């Protein structure tokens, strides 16, 4: 069996963040919570989510692989109000996931499930030379600046600085976060540099993986030259991890 009750607002954030990159995913359910990983259709990005049972108000789960149409689930979750309780209930016999919103009014939806099993897709264990922790709002603003210039962006770590850079045929954009400068609002909360590095990425993907963040969310970004960028952040106790392949420059 699988049955879980949680806050609608928090679950909505997790689903929105995941569905920005993938249309379907397999929820791997067990007594410890929900895990899921999937590649985007072009195999450029990987998304992984983990919702431990502690983030739910009530949780019961045996081992199940639940194939979810994320687009359908996202549309249903969007109908939920933040103060409503959200109840997820697996009907294994009918191969459906029941989604119930409960307040003084009860609303119930059912989603047909995909007949899929776990892909055993995991975030690879990569050793990165550099990592930074930065507020999502500042990172997103830098992406917006870069978008004015090009559809690709370079992330650089060099000389105690984290640099977000974009160059077009005529114009360029650069945002520099300096670890050596006092930062009263802790925009750059952590900076660990092992070596200078730079990698270039598709800007649209970076926008998608940060689209559901709040300005004060802390992104942990792992970087290395011509390596995939790994971005981690938490939403009310749930963990989201994104991996994006670099654009190899000739």
From Swiss-Prot:
Recorded GO terms, molecular function? DNA binding; DNA polymerase processivity factor activity
Signal sequence interval, chain numbering = none
Which InterPro entries does the record cross-reference, listed alphabetically? Answer: DNA_clamp_sf, Pr_cel_nuc_antig, Pr_cel_nuc_antig_C, Pr_cel_nuc_antig_CS, Pr_cel_nuc_antig_N
A single Pfam family it belongs to is: PCNA_C
Output one GO BP term.
leading strand elongation
Check the record and name the PROSITE patterns matching this protein: PCNA_1
Gene3D superfamilies in the record, alphabetically? 3.70.10.10
Alphabetical keyword list: DNA replication, DNA-binding
Task: Give the family per the record.
Answer: Belongs to the PCNA family.
The job of this chain, per UniProt, is described as: Sliding clamp subunit that acts as a moving platform for DNA processing. Responsible for tethering the catalytic subunit of DNA polymerase and other proteins to DNA during high-speed replication.
What interactions and quaternary structure are annotated?
A: Homotrimer. The subunits circularize to form a toroid; DNA passes through its center. Replication factor C (RFC) is required to load the toroid on the DNA.
Q: What is this protein called?
A: DNA polymerase sliding clamp
The organism is: Methanococcus maripaludis (strain C5 / ATCC BAA-1333)
């Amino acid at each position: 069996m699988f049955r879980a009750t949680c806050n609608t607002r928090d679950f909505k954030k997790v689903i929105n963040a995941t569905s920005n990159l993938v249309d379907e995913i397999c929820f791997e359910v067990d007594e410890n919570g929900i895990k899921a990983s999937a590649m985007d259709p072009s195999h450029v990005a990987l998304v992984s989510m983990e919702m431990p049972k502690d983030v739910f108000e009530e949780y019961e789960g045996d081992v199940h692989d639940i194939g979810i149409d994320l687009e359908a689930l996202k549309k249903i979750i969007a109908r939920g109000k933040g103060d409503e309780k959200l109840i997820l209930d697996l009907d294994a016999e009918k191969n459906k996931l029941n989604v119930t919103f409960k307040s003084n009014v009860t609303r119930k939806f059912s989603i047909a499930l995909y007949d899929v099993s776990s892909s055993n897709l995991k975030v690879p264990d990569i050793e990165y030379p550099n990592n930074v922790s930065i507020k999502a709002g500042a990172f997103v603003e830098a992406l917006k600046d870069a978008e004015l210039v090009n559809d690709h962006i370079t992330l650089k770590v060099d000389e105690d600085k984290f640099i977000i850079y974009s160059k077009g045929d005529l114009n360029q954009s650069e945002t520099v976060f300096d670890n050596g400068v006092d930062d009263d609002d802790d925009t750059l909360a952590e900076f660990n540099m092992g070596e200078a590095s730079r990698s270039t990425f598709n800007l649209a993907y970076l926008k998608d993986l940060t689209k559901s963040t709040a300005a004060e969310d802390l992104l942990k970004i792992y970087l290395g030259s011509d390596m995939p960028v790994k971005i981690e952040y938490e939403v009310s106790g749930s963990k989201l991890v994104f991996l994006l392949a670099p654009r190899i420059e000739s």
